[in-house]
């Protein structure tokens, strides 16, 4: 109603709400239900559920609004949550109806939405994951492990990759697959990645100060990081803060970031190279337009995704594909890291 009030005035907006309330009161009496006003521009009604009745209610509410909008087309939306007759009516039903109404508001073609349990469960799981992760982050239960990169000819550890790990309250490790998508969607992954980057830089500095051997460590950069912050500047600041040569901090960017944000990634890789950092294309072969991208992108190393690694004794397509990829990389003078060979 905010936009309606700006165009037609608060008084006219109040008349719309009064007319909608009258319509719902009439339906309440006719259906032996209960109607109410939630505040702002939200109403609710509890009646026996029938699909035809739902659309009849919507049409009557729409007609009440249409009398006031001068043909501009302010379309109300309605979220419907059917209640199991064997279950007690609780505030949970209201929350589900409000959740469903958000979908209706975003659908300019179909303004009536029926509750979908799977959508609600996904949304609930999303917020639960974020909440629990933030608690774990505050409690110091977010850390990283270093996965070694080994020279296949000599067996020497020549590098490592910093992999984020969430330690559960019981000490178990929670797979990144279960929480990284939610962090990327919410944007919290930027906070996480900066935390991991700084942790690795501090660890490298500590080993150098103790006279211990160090190897370059790969730091993962997501598409969200690229859009949300100046990654090259941040990496340069970390290297300066911990007095590290940039060769010790390798920057891994997923192939999906290359394909989805090619201009931003091109600029980032150029800035990183200017500052002395090397760049890896992670998950090579899992995105789109891989061959065309290799021709244009300025990358130092490619990492083949573990899905291409042949199983024991597999000399079929997987082996042929990975052989072709290695030959292609060699012809382009690109070093290759293969995941999952262990």
Located regions from the model:
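Alpha-helical scaffold within the catalytic cores of cyclic-nucleotide enzymes
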Residues: 20-25, 53-71, 95-98, 196-206
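Catalytic-site-adjacent helices and loops of nucleotide signaling machinery
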Residues: 1-17, 39-40, 172-176, 185, ...
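Conserved long alpha-helical elements within nucleotide-processing catalytic cores of c-di-GMP signaling
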Residues: 1-25, 36-40, 44, 52-55, ...
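C-di-GMP signaling machinery
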Residues: 90, 99-145, 153, 182-189, ...
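Catalytic core of bacterial c-di-GMP phosphodiesterases, primarily the EAL and HD-GYP domains
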Residues: 156-161, 188-264, 339-340
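A short glycine-enriched loop-to-beta-strand structural element that forms part of the catalytic core
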Residues: 37-46, 70-104, 110-116, 215-222
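Active-site core of bacterial EAL-family cyclic-dinucleotide phosphodiesterase domains
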Residues: 125-182, 220, 281, 338
